[in-house]
Amino acid sequence: MWIKICGNTNAQDPQLAASAGADAVGFVFAPSPRQVTPEQVAAIAPQLPDDLTRVGVFQTRDFDEIASTVRMAGLHGIQLHGGLDLSLIDKLRAEFSWRQFLIQAISWQVDGDPMESEQRFLNDLGAVVRHGVADALLIDAKTTTASGGTGRTFDWKHAREVLDSHPTPVHIIIAGGLHPGNVREAIVTLRPWGVDVSSGVESQPGKKAPEILEDFIRAARFAFLEIEPGPMLPVEAPPV
């Protein structure tokens, strides 16, 4: 089980996440109400526990920009959004070897034709699995106007059926519209390796609500106890 609290903009929220039992925290370097700079994260990082995985969220395809940010901010993981670029993953793996936990986000479109959404999802899933370099796949909800971070859920039951028919050895992380009231259902339905939440534990964009965050982590932990890892759910933790 792996719980990531994303969209952090200050030192207090990731500290709270760590004390509540989160495994990782995320910092958004893409245009967003929660966007931060490498300098901000570099100042926050020394205030966090050594065993708390720090993940940077990127939408750029600029390798030099990502690599520079990783070093300056002191990150342990790289999360890529905005479509597949397998050559970028190759470059990042070559640059950082296995010192960085690489997460590739793929989307489940929640508007438009359901069959087309499923086929696009399968195409991306297959491409990443065949490529074999990413450590994890993050499944997020997508709309015609936003490729992720929508705060909307996708069809968990349908996604579970698709994943059952296309087993993958890669870690599966789910995101999109999660909050304390629905994270148990999401975990029990999809049986992922991890969950990722941002707006679902906030009092306002970029500011976490302590009670909501703690409730989310507690609900997620209890839900993970209800499921058993299947062959698609390796149990190794990402490097820190």
Describe each region flagged by the PLM.
Residues 17, 78, 137, 155, ...:
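Conserved, mostly hydrophobic/aromatic
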Residues 1-50, 76:
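Basic, often amphipathic N-terminal segments
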Residues 6, 57, 81, 172-178, ...:
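Glycine-rich beta-strand-to-loop/alpha-helix junction loops that act as flexible
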Residues 39-48, 91-93, 198-240:
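C-terminal helical cap(s) of enzyme catalytic domains, especially alpha/beta-barrels
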Residues 165, 171-188, 202:
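A C-terminal functional module that forms or caps the active site or interfaces directly
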Residues 18-21, 70-71, 129-130, 187-188:
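Non-catalytic positions within long, well-ordered alpha-helices that form the structural scaffold/packing
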Residues 29-33, 40, 47-171, 227:
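Conserved anion-binding
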Residues 22-33, 79-85, 141-146, 189-213:
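Glycine-rich phosphate-binding active-site loops on the catalytic face of alpha/beta enzymes
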